[in-house]
Curated annotation (Swiss-Prot):
Residues modified as 3-methylthioaspartic acid: D89
TM region(s), chain numbering: none
Disulfide links within the chain: none
Species per Swiss-Prot/TrEMBL record: Campylobacter hominis (strain ATCC BAA-381 / DSM 21671 / CCUG 45161 / LMG 19568 / NCTC 13146 / CH001A)
Purpose of the protein: With S4 and S5 plays an important role in translational accuracy.
Record protein name field: Small ribosomal subunit protein uS12
Entry keywords, A to Z: Methylation, Ribonucleoprotein, Ribosomal protein, RNA-binding, rRNA-binding, tRNA-binding
């Protein structure tokens, strides 16, 4: 514990919070253009072909974003909406593509958690 004299000489340092999604520049989402759409494999205990896209954002950053849900219609030059949120088993993937916004279609035949995948309510 410092003395009052020590605090007068040198004040306490503020803890600077580091953003987990710096490419969004403090915005909730950002628009971007897909430069490459491909699949990649996850880290050690898991095994799959995860769908990801390299996206050039309006903020100037080029980021790797995860495409959630079953099936997608994205290709190069698709305009997408990107939100934050990392994928734990894919190193370097710190963003998600929002389904059902801009050029991204919602997930077809989705009945639960529909709002997360841009799916409309099914007809009775």
């Amino acid at each position: 514990m410092p003395t009052i004299n020590q605090l007068v000489r040198k004040e306490r340092k503020k803890i600077i919070e580091k953003s987990k999604s710096p490419a969004l520049k403090n915005c909730p989402q950002r628009r971007g253009v897909c430069t490459r759409v491909y699949t990649t494999t996850p880290k050690k205990p898991n095994s799959a072909l995860r769908k990801v896209a390299k996206v050039r954002l309006t903020s100037g950053f080029e980021v790797i974003s995860y495409i959630g849900g079953e099936g997608h219609n994205l290709q190069e030059h698709s305009i997408v909406l990107v939100r934050g949120g990392r994928v734990k088993d894919l190193p370097g993937v710190k963003y998600h593509i929002v389904r059902g916004a801009l050029d991204t279609a919602g997930v077809a035949k989705r009945t639960v958690s529909r709002s997360k995948y841009g799916a409309k309510r099914p007809k009775k």
